[in-house]
Amino acid sequence: MNIYDVSEHAGVSIATVSRVLNGNPNVSERTREKVLRVMDELGYTPNVFARGLGLDTMQTIGIMCSDSSDPYLAGAIYYLERELRSHSYDSILCCTGYDLKVKQKYFNLLRSKRVDAIILAGSKFVELRPEDNDYILKAAAEIPVMLVNGYLEGKNIYSTVCDDYAAVYDAVSRLIHSGSRRILYLYTSYSYSGLNKMDGYKSALISCGLPVREDLIHQCPKNIEDARDLLLRLAEQGIDFDAVVTSDDSLAVGAVKYAHARHISIPDKFSVIGYNNSLLARCTDPEITSIDSRVEFLCTTTVPDAYESFQRRRGSRTDYDRF
């Protein structure tokens, strides 16, 4: 049973049924009563798509994230959905993984659902090759696209980002001023956020008169044990480091496990700084010093931006908020 059946049985157009569903006053009382009576007789329950046929809005926002098991992204999803509910909007969540074709598939799926906007949570949706972002740019001509801690230049695209460069720069500078000289950096990816963090690390070293040593920069899967084992291997190879800064708290937990395995005292002999200030940072002994990426604030800023973007029908520029 659908809106077309109601239209046929009531002898009115689909548009009229839609106007009745949405409480449009431009329907006579007689017609309204007839449509409602037919709906009752047929046992028809309107869904959000049917209601949206006569409106410019579905009251629904699409959310995409690469990995909902990631503590940062799990938090982002929670805050986004909470904020959307406060604006009386529903959400459709798609967890895409990291494959570009899968991202494109789910992006197009959300477009087919006629959502009012699409929110891309995290920086993994902005690809290094510009042509791989074309599907987002083309879609933004029709629907607002919001990025949480990702940046893409284009019309009708709105970015809210944490200043990852400044955050890591300040953290590394503080370590150096506290006496650390051989600061190892662990990172997970070359995403928009990851590149800014890397630049912050290198710039802090240069500003403080220390060399950028490639043997102290290592990529690592976002896994606690992998981070621990990598540091153990580096130590066995004779690479000396007195502090570790990581692009994610999971890697920082691995650094703490490394220190425990080597019987190195934290923070007396060894310093560890993580990123995102997630629950993981409070689950070690001692607790990890972690940079707060302010994910809640980013998300509670993104949703009002999304709301305004399709309420006011903006689209002539890229909005860019940095915190």
Annotate each predicted stretch with a short phrase.
Residues T16-R19, L53-S69, R182-T188:
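Short beta-strand segments enriched in small/hydrophobic residues
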Residues D56-S173, H177, A235-E236:
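Alpha-helical recognition/docking segments in bacterial nutrient-uptake
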Residues N156-Y185, L195, S203, N223-R233, ...:
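Hydrophobic alpha-helical segments within soluble ligand-binding/sensing domains
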